[in-house]
Amino acid sequence: MNITDVRIRKISAEGKMKAIVSVTFENQFVVHDIKVIEGQNGLFIAMPSRKTPDGEFKDIAHPINTETREQIQKAILDEYEKVKNLDVQE
């Protein structure tokens, strides 16, 4: 499944969450609310999730193999690096 669009919807210079992203696949399916997070080993993505009644977070949508996760993460982080200095909202 090809990634046809990556939209960085919100960028923040403060805190560990750096951006909120939407990714479109094959111009047919979009996943909103993917987060770009700054961790101890650099930036990574967190798929959209919701909090369960017992306080645990569960992904709403996520890739089912490593290759797809890496493809999505690379596309998002490449786009984030392009736009992060253009539109910083504090």
Swiss-Prot record:
Keyword annotations: Cell cycle, Cell division, Septation
Cross-referenced Pfam families: SpoVG
Disulphide bond pairs: none
InterPro entries with a match to the protein in the record: SpoVG (IPR007170), SpoVG_sf (IPR036751)
Record-level GO BP terms: division septum assembly; sporulation resulting in formation of a cellular spore
Keyword Cell cycle set for record: yes
Function: Could be involved in septation.
Family: Belongs to the SpoVG family.
Full protein name: Putative septation protein SpoVG
Gene source species: Clostridium perfringens (strain 13 / Type A)
